[in-house]
Amino acid sequence: MQKPLAIFLMGPTASGKTDLAIALRQQIPVEVISVDSALIYKGMDIGTAKPSKAELELTPHRLIDILDPSESYSVMNFREDALREMADITAQGKIPLLVGGTMLYYKALLDGLSPLPSADPDIRAEIEAKAEQIGWAGLHQELVNIDPISAKRINPNDSQRINRALEVFYISGKTMTELTAQQGEAIPYEIMQFAIVPQERAVLHQRIEQRFHKMINLGFEQEVRRLYQRGDLNVDLPSIRCVGYRQMWEYLEGQTSLDEAIFKGICATRQLAKRQITWLRGWTSEIEWLDSLDPENSYKKMIEKVQQKHLKLW
């Protein structure tokens, strides 16, 4: 039995994924699912470059605005939600089009989840108590000794990921690296994968800087200030650690000037884009590459490739 078709449209931030997805929906019977760990949060619209109200009316996106910023969301949560939405779209006779830049989410969909143990509140409390004694940098050094590969990927200030990596080891006796190497259940779809990336990195850097300044003009500082004034959010939450938000939060706490926060936000966004491109360059599955500097040809190429694969869909 032939698997149903699904399409991945991947790419770094500011590469033009949303515009391309909107254009595709006018021509192909697709429904969009967001693959973005920042767009899930309500009230975080400007700094995440969330599609506008007009864009969402034209092309609705699923898995946008599903959580309050105080809530956490795991890769497992995403996989369950995405598979549910994909099944619903397929049942309507349409094609799921998954659009975004959170590469870990795509990997979880393709390969399934590795058998990581569930969280243990008691062990987490022990780790946090130890952090109060020696600091998260000290615990990061402990992780270096236990699981150097994971430690290399985790910032010494990233308390949540350090906690999780140590928790996994304390519960299972195996490192995060060992367990994530074990694949889970693969996705029950035939996947066409596209990646839209500018051929010149300097152009992407320029786009990122321009977009960040545009967000400032649209009221990004005020958006973060509203979150800050709630009183129940902090910089350790995944929502506030999103690029741009963390830097603006530091400004509101008086740690930096506004100009410095903007500069740091632009740098952090460029680093995110670099990581996303690195993920894509190392992707093991077959990818059709699109040039974001040539959106018209990218659009034509996607239409042509999908129609070639499934001529009888139209």
Curated annotation (Swiss-Prot):
Monomer. One of its GO terms (molecular function) is tRNA dimethylallyltransferase activity. This is tRNA dimethylallyltransferase. ATP binds at residues 11-18. HAMAP family: IPP_trans. Its cofactor is Mg(2+). It comes from Glaesserella parasuis serovar 5 (strain SH0165). The gene is miaA. It comes from the Bacteria. Belongs to the IPP transferase family. Residues 36-39, 160-164, 241-246, 274-281 are annotated as: Interaction with substrate tRNA. It is an enzyme of class 2 (transferase). Pfam families: IPPT. One of its GO terms (biological process) is tRNA modification. Keywords: ATP-binding, Magnesium, Nucleotide-binding, Transferase, tRNA processing. Its EC number is 2.5.1.75. The record marks 102, 124 as: Interaction with substrate tRNA. Substrate binds at residues 13-18. It catalyses: adenosine(37) in tRNA + dimethylallyl diphosphate = N(6)-dimethylallyladenosine(37) in tRNA + diphosphate. InterPro entries: Dimethylallyltransferase, IPT, P-loop_NTPase. Catalyzes the transfer of a dimethylallyl group onto the adenine at position 37 in tRNAs that read codons beginning with uridine, leading to the formation of N6-(dimethylallyl)adenosine (i(6)A).
